[in-house]
Amino acid sequence: MSAYAFVNYVRFKTQADAYTGTPYQNFSINEQRVYDGITYSFAPFAISSGGGARGGERSSASLVAGTDAISVNLFAEAVRERYMLEIKTVSLDPLTFTDEALVASEIWRVASYDMDTTRVVLKLTSPLDAVDRKSVV
C-alpha cells in the first residue's frame, strides 16, 4: 500500500504584486514550515478546486477555514483589497514529512467570501476572469 502526504502553502498578493500578511501552511499543526526560504505559520484550512468549462481548465476554487475572527477579517480584507492568492501544493516524504516535490503552483483572484457559524469560504476565480474578453486582441 502506498502512502501520500501533501501540504498547501498559501500567500496573499496585492494588486501591486507584493506579498502581504502572514504566509500559511495546512499540514504541521501548531508549527512553522519553511519552504523555498519562506516561513509559513500553521492555519487549519482546506483548498477545494472546482471544475471549469474553459478548455478543461479550472476556473474557480475556494479556500475554506473555520469561522474565527482572524479568518473572517483576513478574508474580508482580501476581498476588499482585491488580493490574489498564491497556492503551492507540495508532496511530502510520507516517513519524514519533509518537502519532496512541487505538485502545483497556482495564482487565483480573490472574488468574494461567505460564512456561517462553522466555516468561512473564500471564493477564488481565475486571474483571467478579470480581463474583459472584448479587450483581448
Language-model regions: role of each:
Residues 1-42:
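Polar/acidic, low-complexity leader/linker segments enriched in S/T/G and N/D
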Residues 7, 25, 30, 62, ...:
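Surface-exposed, interaction-prone regions used to assemble/regulate multi-protein complexes
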Residues 7-18, 70-112:
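Short, acidic/charged, Gly/Pro-enriched secondary-structure junctions
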Residues 33-55, 60:
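N-terminal, Lys/Arg-enriched amphipathic/low-complexity engagement segments
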Residues 56, 112-127:
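Short, solvent-exposed secondary-structure boundary/capping segments
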Residues 59-75:
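Charged, amphipathic alpha-helical segments
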Residues 66-68, 90, 115, 127-129:
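Solvent-exposed coil/turn segments that connect beta secondary-structure elements
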Residues 136:
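Conserved small/polar residues in nucleotide/adenosyl-binding loops
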